[in-house]
C-alpha cells in the first residue's frame, strides 16, 4: 500500500478520483468510471431533486390559433331531439295500446 501524506484531505488522496472527468456517456466503460458514475448510470439511482415539467401555456399575444367557442358549431344531441318527456309519452301510449300480457 502506498504511503499517503497525512496532511492531504481524504478526497485529494491519489487514486481517490479518476484522472478523467465524468461524462454523459452510458457505455459500459463509462458506467464503471467511478463510484458515482456506477450508481447514477449503472444502477440508475439519482438522489437529486426531480424537476417538474412545465405545462404548455397559451401565448399571451393576440395571435390565437383556435376559433372562439361562439364560432364553433354546436354539437349534435344524440337520441331523440324532442326531449325525454315526449319519448316517455310514446312509451306509455304503446304500453296502453298493446295488451300482449
Curated annotation (Swiss-Prot):
Q: Which Gene3D superfamilies match?
A: Tat domain
Q: Where does Zn(2+) 2 bind?
A: 25, 27, 30
Sites binding Zn(2+) 1 sit at: 22, 33-34, 37
Q: Which residues carry this modification: N6-acetyllysine?
A: 28, 50-51
Annotated keywords: Acetylation, Activator, AIDS, Apoptosis, Host cytoplasm, Host nucleus, Host-virus interaction, Inhibition of host innate immune response by virus, Inhibition of host interferon signaling pathway by virus, Interferon antiviral system evasion, Isopeptide bond, Metal-binding, Methylation, Modulation of host chromatin by virus, Modulation of host PP1 activity by virus, Phosphoprotein, RNA-binding, Secreted, Transcription, Transcription regulation, Ubl conjugation, Viral immunoevasion, Zinc
Annotated stretches, region: Disordered? 1-20, 47-101
Tell whether Acyltransferase is among the UniProt keywords: no
User: What does the UniProt record tell us about how this protein is modified after translation?
Assistant: Asymmetrical arginine methylation by host PRMT6 seems to diminish the transactivation capacity of Tat and affects the interaction with host CCNT1.
> Which superkingdom does the taxonomy of this entry point to?
Viruses
InterPro entries (alphabetical):
IV_Tat (IPR001831), Tat_dom_sf (IPR036963)
Question: Which residue stretches does the UniProt record annotate as biased composition, category Basic residues?
Answer: 48-58
Give the subcellular location: Host nucleus, Host nucleolus; Host cytoplasm; Secreted
**Region entry Interaction with the host capping enzyme RNGTT, spans:** 49-86
Q: Which residues carry this modification: Asymmetric dimethylarginine?
A: 52-53
Job of this protein: Transcriptional activator that increases RNA Pol II processivity, thereby increasing the level of full-length viral transcripts. Recognizes a hairpin structure at the 5'-LTR of the nascent viral mRNAs referred to as the transactivation responsive RNA element (TAR) and recruits the cyclin T1-CDK9 complex (P-TEFb complex) that will in turn hyperphosphorylate the RNA polymerase II to allow efficient elongation. The CDK9 component of P-TEFb and other Tat-activated kinases hyperphosphorylate the C-terminus of RNA Pol II that becomes stabilized and much more processive. Extracellular circulating Tat can be endocytosed by surrounding uninfected cells via the binding to several surface receptors such as CD26, CXCR4, heparan sulfate proteoglycans (HSPG) or LDLR. Neurons are rarely infected, but they internalize Tat via their LDLR. Through its interaction with nuclear HATs, Tat is potentially able to control the acetylation-dependent cellular gene expression. Modulates the expression of many cellular genes involved in cell survival, proliferation or in coding for cytokines or cytokine receptors. Tat plays a role in T-cell and neurons apoptosis.
**Domain comment (free text):** The cell attachment site mediates the interaction with ITGAV/ITGB3 and ITGA5/ITGB1 integrins, leading to vascular cell migration and invasion. This interaction also provides endothelial cells with the adhesion signal they require to grow in response to mitogens.
Reproduce the miscellaneous comment text: HIV-1 lineages are divided in three main groups, M (for Major), O (for Outlier), and N (for New, or Non-M, Non-O). The vast majority of strains found worldwide belong to the group M. Group O seems to be endemic to and largely confined to Cameroon and neighboring countries in West Central Africa, where these viruses represent a small minority of HIV-1 strains. The group N is represented by a limited number of isolates from Cameroonian persons. The group M is further subdivided in 9 clades or subtypes (A to D, F to H, J and K).
Q: Please identify the protein, giving its name as recorded.
A: Protein Tat
Q: Which organism is it from?
A: Human immunodeficiency virus type 1 group M subtype F2 (isolate MP257) (HIV-1)
The gene name reads tat
Amino acid at each position: 500500500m502506498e504511503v499517503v501524506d497525512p496532511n492531504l484531505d481524504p478526497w485529494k488522496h491519489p487514486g481517490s478520483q479518476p484522472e478523467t472527468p465524468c461524462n454523459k456517456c452510458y457505455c459500459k466503460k463509462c458506467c464503471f468510471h467511478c463510484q458515482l458514475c456506477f450508481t447514477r448510470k449503472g444502477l440508475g439511482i439519482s438522489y437529486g431533486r426531480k424537476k417538474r415539467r412545465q405545462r404548455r401555456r397559451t401565448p399571451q399575444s393576440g395571435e390565437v390559433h383556435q376559433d372562439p367557442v361562439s364560432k364553433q358549431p354546436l354539437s349534435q344531441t344524440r337520441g331523440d331531439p324532442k326531449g325525454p318527456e315526449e319519448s316517455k309519452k310514446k312509451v306509455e301510449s304503446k304500453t296502453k295500446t298493446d295488451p300482449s300480457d
